[in-house]
Every structure is written in C-alpha cells, then in structure tokens.
C-alpha cells in the first residue's frame, strides 16, 4: 500500500489547461502535482529534475510535441504517461500512435462547444493516474507488430461476406487499459479463414472506437469493424462495441446478430464486458470462449463466471503480460475462469478452440 502521494508532472501548452488539471488533481490527497511544463523539451528537463511518478501529456504542443517527448520518455525509463487527448478524429489517430509508443493510457478531453467540461472526466483522470502510479513497473514485453510490414504483406484473400459461414466459436473479449496494443498483437496473428467470430468490449470513449477499428482492420487478415446493430456473427469477423453503447447478441432464424443499446452503465461502464459476457453465455453457452484481459477495475469479472457455468471456456490474461492486472485478477480470485494464459499464447488458443464443429444458427 502506497503511503506517499503520487507525484505528477503536467505537460500542456495551454496555461489554462495546466491550471485546470493541476487544480483538479490536487483535490485528491493521494496526488501531488510537483510541476508543470508548456512543451516537450521543457517537460523532459522537468522529468530529469523532479523525477515524477506519472506524467500527464498533451500531444499537440509547439517546439517539441507530445509524441516526440513520449519517444524520449520511453527510451529513458519507465515513467508512466497518461495522454490527455483531444476528442477529435485527429486526436484519436494520434492517441493510438502514442499508445503504441508506450503511453500507459489516455483520457479524452471534452470537445470545445460541448456541454461537458474537464471536471466531467476528473474521476477518470485521477483513477488512471492512481493505477499508473501503483504500477511503476516495466511494461510487459510482447512480440511487437510492425504495422507497415503487416499492411504490405500478402495476406490470404478474405472470403466475401456472402460466402462466409456461421462461426465455430463465439469469442467474447473484455479489455481496458493496455487493450489497444494487446488486441493489435492478438488479432493480427489470426488468419483470414479464422473460423470463429470475435466480439470485443474495449473501454474507450465514443468516437475513438471507430478510429481504433479502422487501425486494426489495416493490420489484420480477418475483418475488423465497429459493430452496428444487426451485424451478423460470421467466421473471420471481429466486431468492436462502439463507445458509450452496450453490446449483446441475439439468435435469429436468418443469422445471429449483435444488438446495441443505450441502457445505463453497468458498474460504471458503457460498454460493459459484464453485459456482453452474460448475453453470450445465455445465447451460446458451451460454444463461447470468453477472455478477460488487461485493465483496471472489475468489469467482466463476475459475468465471465456465467460463461464458465454455461459450459464455455473462461480465460484470464496472466499478470506478467497485463499492463494492469485488475479485471483478470478479480475474475481469478472469484474462481470465475478455467485458465490463465499469457498474451503471447492467446492467438494459438483462439485458433485451436475455433477449429471445431461450426455453430448452427438453429441448434
């Protein structure tokens, strides 16, 4: 248990934003803002001088921008960085680049003209700083994925949608902090003729999931898209739940589909892995493989037990390969999983589990 405050450096080119973030963080006695910086170059000097536990970082700054500063930070050591990102398409694009470079996590600033203010995301920023400050360990080492190489590689042609069959397995994934890189690694290993369908709840703001889906699609042989109500569960397809929606499945005579809803958050989350896991357990039972992966909190830790109880396979990512061992740890402690597996082994597990008799929409 930490007994001293988490020492935070705030880096942002806006004097107003630096002041607002500082005032917001200092309301929590577990956090101490030890300094601020207006650009990346000054921020690096402050890191050397003050040795913060966590850095909050704006990406769009003059002189040295946040991306360049992040490159230097990841080369120099293990100081966790929380990106405070613009809630725009360009902001989402840059945020995912930052996560690949080694940022610990991100928070989306409300858009100008929005009714939301920075105070609306205060709890999220504070929670992520606390998790990052507690982690303070080397990020798990996983095999890196060269996106450019993946895009240029000759992949097997993806079967057209009309010719694809019902899937052999329904794979449901709940994931949070550390998820973008883990999903890129895992999904990019799957072949175009992968026999399962994949449903993903990644804790991410509305608007960011579309950009995230597009980035994954560029690097994967399987189809990856942001889910829409009525999307069919097809072999070789991964559907990512949109931010601020819940995702369930429904069995239909003409093909099984996903259904999105605007129901209230569950355990503080929308989308919620608990909602997805309960739905797939009810509809598909033993034909489900559920993964609870890296992330803070306990979303999905209870409902993955419903998959296990229904005869499906419930899998938790192990501590060594998790950026934050929160969600999987709680699921393990509650006895709700069958296996604990490292990230490097998950692609093979999915391929082996999916190499089975295909699901019929009528059984």
Curated annotation (Swiss-Prot):
Enzyme Commission number: 3.1.1.61, 3.5.1.44
CheB-type methylesterase domain mapped to chain residues: 160-357
Family under the similarity heading: Belongs to the CheB family.
Domain Response regulatory per the UniProt entry, residue ranges: 7-124
Cellular component terms per the entry's GO annotation: cytoplasm
Reaction catalysis annotation: [protein]-L-glutamate 5-O-methyl ester + H2O = L-glutamyl-[protein] + methanol + H(+); L-glutaminyl-[protein] + H2O = L-glutamyl-[protein] + NH4(+)
In-chain residues carrying the UniProt-annotated modification 4-aspartylphosphate: 58
UniProt remark on domains: Contains a C-terminal catalytic domain, and an N-terminal region which modulates catalytic activity.
Primary subcellular site in the record, as a coarse category: cytoplasm
PTM per Swiss-Prot/TrEMBL: Phosphorylated by CheA. Phosphorylation of the N-terminal regulatory domain activates the methylesterase activity.
Cross-referenced SUPFAM superfamilies: CheY-like, Methylesterase CheB, C-terminal domain
Keywords assigned: Chemotaxis, Cytoplasm, Hydrolase, Phosphoprotein
Entry GO MF terms: phosphorelay response regulator activity; protein-glutamate methylesterase activity; protein-glutamine glutaminase activity
HAMAP family in the record: CheB_chemtxs
Localisation per UniProt entry: Cytoplasm
A Pfam family per the record: Response_reg
CDD domains, per the entry: CheB_Rec, REC_CheB-like
Record-annotated active site: 176, 203, 299
Name of the featured protein: Protein-glutamate methylesterase/protein-glutamine glutaminase 2
GO biological process, one term: chemotaxis
Gene of this entry: cheB2
Function recorded in the entry: Involved in chemotaxis. Part of a chemotaxis signal transduction system that modulates chemotaxis in response to various stimuli. Catalyzes the demethylation of specific methylglutamate residues introduced into the chemoreceptors (methyl-accepting chemotaxis proteins or MCP) by CheR. Also mediates the irreversible deamidation of specific glutamine residues to glutamic acid.
């Amino acid at each position: 248990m930490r007994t001293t405050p988490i020492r935070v450096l705030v880096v942002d080119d806006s004097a107003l934003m630096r002041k607002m973030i500082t005032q917001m963080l200092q309301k929590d006695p577990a956090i101490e803002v030890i300094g601020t910086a207006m650009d990346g170059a000054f921020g690096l000097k402050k890191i050397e001088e003050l040795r913060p536990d966590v850095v909050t970082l704006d990406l769009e700054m003059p002189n040295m921008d946040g991306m360049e500063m992040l490159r230097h930070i990841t080369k120099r050591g293990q100081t966790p960085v929380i990106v405070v990102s613009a809630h725009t398409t360009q902001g989402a694009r840059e945020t995912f680049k930052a996560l690949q470079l080694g940022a610990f996590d991100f928070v989306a600033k409300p858009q100008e003209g929005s009714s939301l203010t920075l105070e609306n995301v205060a709890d999220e920023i504070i929670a992520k700083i606390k998790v990052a400050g507690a982690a303070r360990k080397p990020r798990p080492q996983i095999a890196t994925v060269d996106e450019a190489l993946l895009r240029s590689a000759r992949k097997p042609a993806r079967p057209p949608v009309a010719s694809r069959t019902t899937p052999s397995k329904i794979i449901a994934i709940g994931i949070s902090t550390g998820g973008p890189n883990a999903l890129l690694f895992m999904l990019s290993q799957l072949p175009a003729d992968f026999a399962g369908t994949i449903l993903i709840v990644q804790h991410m703001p509305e608007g960011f999931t579309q950009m995230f889906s597009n980035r994954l699609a560029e690097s994967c042989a399987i189809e990856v898209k942001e889910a829409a109500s009525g999307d069919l569960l097809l072999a070789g397809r991964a559907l990512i739940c949109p931010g601020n929606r819940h995702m369930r499945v429904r069995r239909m005579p003409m093909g099984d589909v996903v259904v999105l809803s605007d129901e209230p958050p569950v355990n503080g989350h929308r989308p919620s892995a608990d909602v997805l896991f309960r739905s797939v357990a009810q509809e598909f039972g033993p034909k489900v493989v559920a993964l609870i992966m890296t992330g803070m909190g306990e979303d999905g830790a209870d409902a993955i037990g419903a998959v296990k109880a229904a005869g499906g396979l419930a899998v938790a990512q192990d501590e060594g390969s998790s950026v934050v061992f929160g969600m999987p740890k709680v699921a393990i402690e509650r006895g709700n999983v069958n296996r604990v597996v490292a990230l490097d082994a998950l692609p093979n597990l999915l391929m082996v589990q999916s190499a089975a008799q295909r699901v019929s929409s009528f059984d």
